[in-house]
Regions:
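N-proximal low-complexity "stem/linker" segments adjacent to membrane-targeting elements
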Residues: 1-31
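Hydrophobic targeting segments
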Residues: 6-12, 37, 45-48
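Short, flexible/disordered intra-domain loops and linkers
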Residues: 17-28, 76-84, 116-125
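Short, acidic, metal-binding catalytic loop of nucleotide-sugar glycosyltransferases
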Residues: 27-44
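Active-site-proximal specificity loops/subdomain of glycosyltransferases
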Residues: 48-98
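Short aromatic/hydrophobic "clamp" motif used to bind/position activated sugar donors
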Residues: 104
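Active-site acidic Asp-centered loop
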Residues: 107-108
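Catalytic core and acceptor-binding pocket of nucleotide-sugar-dependent glycosyltransferases
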Residues: 113-120, 124-202
C-alpha cells in the first residue's frame, strides 16, 4: 500500500522555469520540481507562490498564489547581496498563508525532491519540553549552504534557503523571525554564496 501525504502542503516559491536572468538553471527546472513532489509525496497539496507574468504552461500545481514583486534588497538605495531575500520572504509567506494542513514544506522553485525520508526524520524527534523552546516541533532544513562561517568569520542565523519542513505554524513563525532580522540588521547579511550543482533534496 502506497504511503500518502495528505497532511502536508508544499509551498513552491520563486520565479518559474528559466525566467529572464534565470537561464543558469536547467531547462524546465520548476516542472521537474513539481513532478518530484507528485512522485515522492503523493497526496500532498502543491501551492505555487510566484510573481505576475510567469510562464505557467504545463505546470502541475493545486493552487496558485501571485504576489507583487518587491524588487531587489536595497540599503541606502543600493542593491545588497543576497539581492532576492525580500522576494523569497514575500513569496514564502504568501504561500504559507494559504496552507490549511498541519505540516508544510517550503521548497525553492529551482530545487526538487529525490525522496521523502525527511518526513520520518522530522517525526523521529521528540517534542521539546524545554522552557526555552521556540517551536512546537523540530524543523528539518537541508545542510547545503547552512553556514557556520563566511570569509573566515563565524556567522549566526544563516540557514540554507532551499528547503524547510515542519509544522505549518512553526514555519510561519520561522519566516516571521527572518523578516524581523532582515529589517533590523540589513548590513549583516553574508556577502558571498557558493553555487552548488546538486539541487536535489533527499
Amino acid at each position: 500500500m502506497q504511503q500518502t501525504f495528505e497532511q502536508i502542503s508544499v509551498v513552491v516559491q520563486g520565479p518559474v522555469q528559466n525566467y529572464q536572468g534565470r537561464t543558469h538553471h536547467e531547462e524546465g527546472i520548476t516542472q521537474r520540481c513539481l513532478e518530484s513532489i507528485r512522485t515522492h509525496l503523493p497526496g500532498a497539496k502543491i501551492i505555487l507562490s510566484t510573481w505576475p507574468d510567469q510562464d505557467l504552461a504545463g505546470l502541475d500545481y493545486d493552487q496558485l498564489v501571485i504576489s507583487q514583486d518587491p524588487g531587489v534588497n536595497l540599503v541606502d538605495g543600493l542593491p545588497q547581496f543576497p539581492k532576492n531575500y525580500n522576494r523569497q520572504l514575500v513569496s514564502t509567506q504568501a504561500g504559507l498563508a494559504q496552507v490549511t494542513t498541519p505540516y508544510a514544506i517550503k521548497l525553492r522553485s529551482d530545487n526538487y525532491l529525490i525522496g521523502n525520508e525527511f518526513v520520518a526524520i522530522q517525526h523521529s524527534f521528540l517534542k521539546s519540553e524545554s522552557e526555552h523552546k521556540v517551536f512546537e516541533e523540530k524543523i528539518v532544513i537541508n545542510s547545503n549552504l547552512f553556514r557556520r562561517t563566511s570569509h573566515g568569520r563565524s556567522v549566526l542565523m544563516s540557514p540554507s534557503d532551499f528547503f524547510y519542513f515542519g509544522r505549518t505554524a512553526n514555519l510561519i513563525k520561522f519566516g516571521n523571525s527572518h523578516y524581523s532580522w532582515i529589517i533590523l540588521l540589513p548590513n549583516m547579511l553574508f556577502r558571498s554564496c557558493s553555487r552548488l550543482p546538486n539541487r536535489a533534496i533527499h
